[in-house]
Amino acid sequence: MTSRVRVAAVQAEPRWLDVAAGVDQVITLIEAASEQGARLVAFPETFIPGFPWWMWLRAVEWDGDILARYHANSMTVDGPELRAIRYAARRRGIHVGLGFSERAGNRVFMSQALIDDQGDITVSRKTLPTALERSVFGTADGPALLRETALGTIGALGGADHFLSGACGAMQRAGEHIHLASWPGFTFCRGDTRIDAAELSTAASRRYARAARSYLLAPTAVVPVRGWQAAAEGRADVLHGGSGVARILGPDGHDLAIPMDPDQEGLLVADLIVATARYRPALPCADRALA
C-alpha cells in the first residue's frame, strides 16, 4: 500500500530563552504547515528555548545567568506549554516532530517529541549528548524515538547521534518509513574549527537516508549573529550568521525540495510516496559521514 504524504521541515530562528514566545512560534509554524497541506512538520533540535550556543563562546561568566534562564525556559513533559502544542497538532490534524529542552527536577535533557494528529505524544531523551553538550544537558537511558503512526513508522534522532553507528543502526533496522534528523543549526566561534559542520551534517543525513532506505526530514535552526545577544555583550565577532541547512531527502539521499538560503526562514515542503506495507531491509550503518 502506498500513500502520498506532504511533509514540512522547519528552518527558522528560535525565540531564544523565551518559552512562551517559542510555543507561540511553534504553533504558528504548525498552522502554516497545515495550511500548505502538510501532514507532518519537523522542528530542529532543542528548538525551544534554542540550542545553547554560549557553550562555544568560552565565556564562563555567562554560564550562571544564562544557564538559569535556560532551565527556567525549558519545558516539562506534562506542562501547559507542551499541552498547547499537542492541542494545536490535534486541532490541525498534523503530526509534529519537536526538539526541545526538557526540564526534569534540576536537570535538563535534549529531548525529541513525536505528536500525532490526535495530540498523543511520545518523548525520548538523547542518551549521550556530546562532551560540550553535557556541560548543560544530562545523559539519559532508554530507546530512541520510534513510533508507528498513520503515516508509517517514524523515527527521530538529534544532531550528532547521526555520526554514531550504534544509535543509527538500531533505528535503521526497525524499518523506518520517515526519519527526522533534528539538527540544531550551525555556527561556531571564528577560528575554532576548520570543519564545516553544516556540510558534515548534510552528508550524514544523506548517508542515513541511503542506509535506512527511508525518507528523511532534516530541520535546522537559523542562528544569526544576534543570537544569544552576543552583540550586546561586546562579542559580535564570535558567531557566524545564517547556518540553516534544512533538507528533505528521498531514500536515495537526493533532495526532494530546493534548499533555502542559509539565513532564510520558512518551511521546506515536499510530497513523499510512502509504501507502508512493504518492509525495506536497512543497509549497514557507518559512523562516518559520506556524501
Q: What does each model-found stretch correspond to?
A:
Residues 1-40:
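N-terminal glycine-/serine-/threonine-rich phosphate-binding loop
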Residues 19, 31-117, 186-203, 207-214:
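Cys-nucleophile CN-hydrolase/nitrilase-fold catalytic domain and related Cys-dependent amidase chemistry
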Residues 128-147, 160-166:
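Active-site glycine-rich loop that binds ribose-phosphate moieties when present
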Residues 125-140, 263-283:
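A short, polar/charged loop-to-alpha-helix boundary motif
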Residues 146-177, 181, 277-291:
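Cysteine/selenocysteine-centered motifs that mediate thiol-based redox chemistry or coordinate metal-sulfur cofactors
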Residues 77-95, 159-266:
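CN hydrolase (nitrilase-like) catalytic-core segments centered on the catalytic cysteine
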Residues 98-100, 110-114, 145, 246-248, ...:
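Short beta-strand scaffold segments in enzyme catalytic cores
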